[in-house]
Amino acid sequence: MSQNKLAALIILDGFAIRDEVKGNAVKQANTPNFDRFWNQYAHNQLEASGKAVGLPDGQMGNSEVGHLNIGAGRIVYQSLTRVNVSIDEGDFYEVDAFIKSVEHAKKHDKALHLFGLLSDGGVHSHINHLFALLRLAKKHELENVFVHAFLDGRDVGPKTASKYIKETQDVMDELGVGQFATISGRYYSMDRDKRWDRVKKCYDAMVYGEGPSYKSAQEVVDDNYANEIYDEFVIPSVITDDNDEPVATIKDEDSIIFYNFRPDRAIQISRTFANEDFRDFERGDKAPKKLDFVMLTNFSETVDGYVAYQPVNLDNTVGEVLAQNNLNQLRIAETEKYPHVTFFMSGGREKEFPGEKRILIDSPKVATYDLKPEMSVYEVTDALLKELDKGEQNAIILNFANPDMVGHSGKLQPTIDAIEAVDECLGKVIDKITELGGHAIITADHGNSDEVMTLEDKPMTAHTTNPVPVIVTKDDIELRDGGILADLSPTLLDLLNVEKPKEMTGNSLIKK
């Protein structure tokens, strides 16, 4: 195979197709380059949610799920689906890591702390998994069970915390097990960009009982709302008892079960509790030691602890197939989506394949990306164009983060600005690839920026279930209907004249 063979997979993160113009940044943005490629080349749309990506029917897709399905070239049944089935069939209550955790707490008269994202968004966690853990604690007759709730407001509506707090309180009251101990917005507890000052605020509330104090979880929300601070950004707060003491703090040898299933935003805070050698901030003299730490799924090799649900092994992902065929590949993205084009695209593998190069461009250090809608798209593009000029790569996997990351703000104009910046860069990248005799697949992993405001003009910060576009920049071809994300890697391999492996049950979108 000639070394000048070139094909690219370009993922416009959070960019989907929706007819309604109102609240739709994709429709309202000026996108001359995307429109040019859509009109010039074969195009269609792909399902990127629900059963098409291994999620429950009607469940919106997300970046982790999307990149896993894309890279695997097959439908990958997601952790949400696996755990739901496990609860329904009763296996959940027999999982070794859970049993050891509750038995450890019971035997040593220690507390069991349950923490995770408190919503039914289904992107990072699901509240039903917390309820199942509370039932497990009840079954084992545990008394000291505490919930450290991370409020969402991003994968669900921005002001929905009260609903989830009430649902959780009702379950705890019904079972006679569990109390809220701390409440934090996910902005603090689930940072993934090394903003350790945020994580420390959450840690200090959970370990030292430091932070604003309230008598109930609902009071935390009410007070923050009064100051126009909504779910995602709620300041880490401590629930106190009748003596104004914290209901619970995390102490030596306590048990912790972290019920998020998606790794990327769970890693940093996990390391603060699980890793004895943690050094990213000073944890203080009373940092709890010898904790029994359980992750719902395998968050990372960098987190010490037990894993409840081990990953499903994915062989022959697109990166592995490219390496087997002695083709060079480049993975490039800015920080926010770097794990997606590397770890998730490779089926949960951290290490590069032979011939794989990775370029990480730092995302801008701003509080929220609506303040800088272009993010680092120009820097990503410049780095890629330089790499293309070298002529060393055969396959490019590129992610433009902006439509998703700015779309999460629920602010229409910044999201339009984000998409227009991406469109400018998309034009440069495709023109360069075409000049070099290569082809590209332009697509997305899920919806978001296609619905930033509701029809009632309220911010819509969650993903959507809308189909995503696919364009293949090759003349004289047609694309078939009925495509899903799992068909993208077989299509990329097709452009490179590489046979797809039997493990890839997806099929090339190019009509034969």
Swiss-Prot record:
Presence of the UniProt keyword ATP-binding in the record: no
Binding site for substrate: H124, R154, D155, R186, R192, R262, P263, D264, R265, K337
UniProt keywords, alphabetically: Glycolysis, Isomerase, Manganese, Metal-binding, Phosphoprotein, Sporulation
Active site positions, chain numbering: S63
The reaction(s) this protein catalyses: (2R)-2-phosphoglycerate = (2R)-3-phosphoglycerate
Keyword Signal applies: no
Free-text remark on how the cofactor is bound: Binds 2 manganese ions per subunit.
InterPro entries the UniProt entry points to: Alkaline_phosphatase_core_sf, BPG-indep_PGM_N, Metalloenzyme, PGAM_B_sf, Pgm_bpd_ind
GO cellular component terms, semicolon-separated: cytosol
SUPFAM superfamilies per record: 2,3-Bisphosphoglycerate-independent phosphoglycerate mutase, substrate-binding domain (SSF64158), Alkaline phosphatase-like (SSF53649)
Names of required cofactors: Mn(2+)
GO molecular function, one term: phosphoglycerate mutase activity
Biological process per Gene Ontology, one example term: glucose catabolic process
HAMAP family: GpmI
Protein family according to the UniProt entry: Belongs to the BPG-independent phosphoglycerate mutase family.
PANTHER family assigned to the protein according to its UniProt record, in alphabetical order: 2,3-BISPHOSPHOGLYCERATE-INDEPENDENT PHOSPHOGLYCERATE MUTASE (PTHR31637:SF0)
Protein name as it appears in the record: 2,3-bisphosphoglycerate-independent phosphoglycerate mutase
Record lineage: Bacteria, Bacillati, Bacillota, Bacilli, Bacillales
